[in-house]
Amino acid sequence: MKRISSILAFAIFTIISLSAQEQKVKVSILGDSYSTFEGYVVEGNELWYGSSPKWDRGNDVVRVWNTWWHRLIDDNGLQLEVNDSWSGSTVCTTSYNGAYRPDNAFIARVDRLGNPDVSLVVGGTNDMWAGSPLGDYQYADWTDDDLKNFRPALCCLFDRLKKRYPNALIYNIENTELKQEFYESCEVICKHYGITRVKLHHISKQLGHPSIDGMQAIARQVWEVMGSRITAGKVY
């Protein structure tokens, strides 16, 4: 009888231990071209990175494990929930040449991130490159016209993320070489919503996009900020 009890206790302990080992923090990404890769983003999204010849642009990132988000997840025992990154997408609905793009703007993709423990927002670069209007700081009652502007759209984005994923940690990852008004906008808006910023620095690029070295630097800098909040498959 004691032998059976011991075996049963050992089996239960093993199951619990394996369950704990398998538990991983789930990470979702809401991004632009910097976070795309062929076969790893939401179907239908535009890409910039990939392994097939048509994505050979002269950038040395040609394998998914070279991307910043794959390095971040693989190196730190995390799990990818959803990567909803779209090349060329803006946070607001005003895109290149003044085109109205409510279909691929960050604020249009908020509900597609699954059930993340951590949400990583990587945007603003195309808003600057496209010359999207900044607009005013606005924290409620957004109209379609308001969301054509970067500041109201970023406010709306964080508001929706916090309501849609109330238990998820949210990080705003900011590219290098943005105009000062974009950094200032992120600072003010992130402070209002309690969003942690990751302000990137010294990122090597090829054709305006992170190279392998740049991707590794992004992964390292993001983990330096968020790593202290993650322990043994849980966020704190």
Q: Positions of the model-derived regions?
A:
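N-terminal secretory targeting modules
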Residues: M1-V64, D74-D75, R112-G114, P166, ...
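Conserved SGNH/GDSL esterase-like catalytic core that processes O-acyl groups on lipids
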Residues: K26-S28, Y40-G135
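A mature extracytoplasmic/lumenal domain signature
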Residues: G31-S33, S85, T176
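Generic structural signal for helix capping and beta-alpha/helix-loop junctions
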Residues: F37, T90-T93, Q180, L207
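Alpha-helical cap/lid subdomain in secreted, periplasmic
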Residues: Y100-Y236
